[in-house]
Amino acid sequence: MSFLSRQQPPPTRRVGAAYSLRQKLIFSPGSDCEEEEEEEEEGSGHSTGEDSAFQEPDSPLPSARSPAEAEAERRRRSPGAEPSSPGELEDDLLLQGGGGGAQAAGGGAEGDSWEEEGFGSSSPVKSPSTAYFLSSPFSPVRCGGPGDASPQGCGAPRAMDDPCSPQPDYPSTPPHKTFRKLRLFDTPHTPKSLLSKARVIDSGSVKLRGSSLFMDTEKSGKREFDTRQTPQVNINPFTPDPVLLHSSGRCRGRKRAYFNDSSEDMEASDYEFEDETRPAKRITITESNMKSRYTTEFHELEKIGSGEFGSVFKCVKRLDGCIYAIKRSKKPLAGSVDEQNALREVYAHAVLGQHPHVVRYFSAWAEDDHMLIQNEYCNGGSLADAISENYRVMSYLTEVELKDLLLQVGRGLRYIHSMSLVHMDIKPSNIFISRTSIPNAVSEEGDEDDWISNKVMFKIGDLGHVTRISSPQVEEGDSRFLANEVLQENYSHLPKADIFALALTVVCAAGAEPLPRNGEQWHEIRQGRLPRIPQVLSQEVTELLRVMIHPDPERRPSAMELVKHSVLLSASRKSAEQLRIELNAEKFKNSLLQKELKKAQMAAKVAAEERALFTDRMATRSTTQSNRTSRLIGKKMNRSVSLTIY
């Protein structure tokens, strides 16, 4: 081949002509150098690609070919053999990808010429895919060393040693587009999983310094924003299913409709997924950076009470003008033991909601390491204040008022126990009095509460010791009202401990001496012996109180049984069901009386009719007799005779 034919850029041909080109190839013996000499003699330095391709013989290096390549060559040389499809031609190209057209991809200026495999000479036919050839060292045809790049496969000597060899030194990389056209892999490219992309990002890929700098800045800013936006919440242990509610938050996975190959989007999505699966953090009572809510929203009127937890203030809310009771802790709670009790009270208030015999809860917040709880204001104070005032003036609650107290607090305990909670600190200072003239509505259970005095309403408050019945975390309350089984850490009958404390609360309201905190009298009470009551109570009430402090908690009535006890449901305090039963009985009696009345009326009517008939008969008989007498008289009488006397 002439030097001019190598330097002149060959004309562009379509790759689709390779199939027809392959069928017209004519092989002639001779070396490459002889062919070039003939071309020089003819003066055909501008020969076309077809002439050079038709007249060039095979490369004289067929000895080191593999059996698969030899079989492919034999099929091409057999007479009448034609490739079945263009895909078969590309398969042959892949088998001999170490040389020929496969090697034409790696060169410099002459790398655009496509060598027809099996001939060893360069063809000026331009391949459209040569612009996309890759120079990657990885190839389906692997060679043993850097010198094994010959078209005959691995282990063959390099053809470039021959000065007349037309093969340049190209790496063994197949055409990129041609390899894709083989469709060896039918499935589409599978996107990387989230974990694999995260590993790729963590391993550190090669990136531009400027782009990575801005990317890190953006991602760090995004993470700081997400951290600020992620709320920290407490988990209420008194909700029906706190574990399920918490786990459902973990399952809020954000589904994407497509996968983005961008590393920024991928890392951002991974971080969002981690934020959603992050467990909720517990908020501690710390100083707030905002303005004091207590002084901003409320106007303090007076201090109405104090206790172990803190002080209670009577306040007016500036917005609505209503009066509330604000409970503020005495000392800072952050990190102290009382913090758990404060949070437990907030949890219990939030779960219990609104009930006529439970102090209503509105809100709670932390301010300057103090807990503040906004509750309903009870204008009658606590029962302990009323007992102290009665003890000072030597006045006690009457038996009717004691029954009223038992029934109302019992209904409050029934509601708390129905929520699978126990109060564990029932005592006079935790029962509040609300005096109102508004008639009470029908309770949730359907019981009519109109019989209750419309002047006094007893409510249960201070829920700092509330715990669950199923998984108790008991914090012992006042020892004066503590049941013995709780002291012995027997938590199998916790609702009955509230009944025990309620009985002693009623005893204190009845005028008994202050209860002992320990000692022999304390044990006597736990053995079922009532303290001395200065007033005389009925036998039924005394027996009910004695049963409520029975040493065996199973013998004590439950809150449900207590509110339906016959002692508390007197003639004026009967339930709607009992009133309905009595009404039905009275209706039955009335129906019987009506039947008797009808019978009496019928009998009287019959008697009157008989009497009238008898009277008529007597009148008819007397008339007949009178007529007969006149006729007789007429017969007996002589005819009148007129006399004329002169």
From Swiss-Prot:
The modification Phosphothreonine is found at residues 187, 190, 239. Its EC number is 2.7.10.2. Synthesis is increased during S and G2 phases, presumably by an increase in transcription; activity is decreased by phosphorylation during M phase. Protein levels fall in M phase as a result of decreased synthesis combined with degradation. Activity seems to be negatively regulated by phosphorylation upon entry into mitosis, although N-terminal phosphorylation might also regulate the protein stability via protection from proteolysis or might regulate the subcellular location. Residues 165-174 have a biased composition (Pro residues). Residues 298-568 form the Protein kinase domain. Residues 96-110 have a biased composition (Gly residues). Keywords: ATP-binding, Cell cycle, Cell division, Kinase, Magnesium, Metal-binding, Mitosis, Nucleotide-binding, Nucleus, Phosphoprotein, Transferase, Tyrosine-protein kinase, Ubl conjugation. Acts as a negative regulator of entry into mitosis (G2 to M transition) by protecting the nucleus from cytoplasmically activated cyclin B1-complexed CDK1 before the onset of mitosis by mediating phosphorylation of CDK1 on 'Tyr-15'. Specifically phosphorylates and inactivates cyclin B1-complexed CDK1 reaching a maximum during G2 phase and a minimum as cells enter M phase. Phosphorylation of cyclin B1-CDK1 occurs exclusively on 'Tyr-15' and phosphorylation of monomeric CDK1 does not occur. Its activity increases during S and G2 phases and decreases at M phase when it is hyperphosphorylated. This is Wee1-like protein kinase. It comes from Mus musculus (Mouse). The lineage of its organism: Eukaryota, Metazoa, Chordata, Craniata, Vertebrata.
